[in-house]
From Swiss-Prot:
Its cofactor is Fe(2+). Binds 2 Fe(2+) ions per subunit. Pfam families: Metallophos. It is an enzyme of class 3 (hydrolase). Coiled coil: none annotated. Belongs to the cyclic nucleotide phosphodiesterase class-III family. GO terms for molecular function: 3',5'-cyclic-AMP phosphodiesterase activity; metal ion binding; nucleotide binding. Fe cation 2 binds at D52, N82, H152, H191. Keywords: Hydrolase, Iron, Metal-binding, Nucleotide-binding, Plasmid. AMP binds at H15, D52, N82, H83, H193. Fe cation 1 binds at D13, H15, D52, H193. This is Probable cyclic nucleotide phosphodiesterase CBUA0032. Its EC number is 3.1.4.-.
Length: 248
């Protein structure tokens, strides 16, 4: 593999609970197994954890994640999802792990930007005019490096009512902005509890499997699949590869 290839793991939708128990939506052992598999692979430059860390808004759920993060040796970036208590998460998780919308992180040939789509108390996502302005300002002024955008809600329709109802509601405003910049190469999101990859114009949109459980693809009703995993991204100079890893 090329030396300048950036290797990323995406972990999403852990839904941890206050106790280390196997509830239907809080899978402590799943999360442990995912991080163990990532560590054993020994190949990643960065890990993005794309929201819904907690399922019950408890301090202990974030403490569980923190104990797992302490065992990792590569850079880790954590963002909130609609199930998270952002203030509590920011209190428990050290700043070095938190990805701020105010900053642009550069690594090799890419810039990485976090867009906060979370609306307090709501399932859907939304970007305010201020959020959109800040985001476009970053794209306009951060140079010519290729861009990777990280967020929780899906910013592109999946043609599935259950998730398109609760996606980033003003996704068209977001898409309008990124279409102005041909160096936006990758948008990583969570929320949808499965592995999706969609190409739109010059940009690849991609989600990882949930750590807790999957919602079966292409079904009109919610059908739970008791499997879990994470997703690898290989960012080469001229192209991007993805690889979904199923633990179970």
């Amino acid at each position: 593999m090329e030396d300048n290839c950036i290797k990323i793991a995406q972990v999403s939708d852990l839904h941890l609970t206050s106790e280390n128990c196997e509830t239907s939506r809080g899978r402590y052992s799943n999360a442990m197994n995912v991080f163990s598999a990532i560590s054993l692979s020994g190949q990643h430059d960065m890990i993005f954890i794309t929201g819904d860390i907690s399922d019950d808004y408890t301090e202990n759920s974030y403490k569980q994640l923190l104990e797992m993060l302490k065992k990792l040796t590569c850079r880790v970036f954590v963002i909130p999802g609609n199930h998270d208590d952002v203030n509590l998460m920011n209190k428990i998780i050290p700043e070095k792990y938190l990805f701020s919308p105010e900053t642009v992180t550069s690594f090799n040939t890419f810039d990485f930007l976090f867009v906060n789509t979370v609306v307090n108390g709501e399932i859907h996502g939304l970007l305010t005019d201020q959020d959109l302005s800040l985001f476009q300002n970053h794209l306009e002024n951060s140079g010519n490096k290729k861009k990777c955008i990280i967020m929780h809600h899906n910013p592109i329709p999946l043609n599935r009512k259950i998730y398109d109802k609760y996606m980033l509601l003003n996704y068209q405003d977001f898409l309008r902005i990124i279409c102005l910049y041909d160096n936006v190469k990758l948008v990583i999101f969570g929320h949808v509890h499965n592995d999706y990859t969609i190409s739109y114009r010059q940009t690849l949109f991609s989600s990882a499997p949930a750590t807790c459980y999957q919602i079966k693809k292409f079904e009109s009703d919610i059908i739970i699949e008791e499997k879990y995993g994470y997703k690898n991204y290989f960012l080469f100079e001229e192209f991007i590869e993805t690889n979904c890893i199923w633990i179970k």
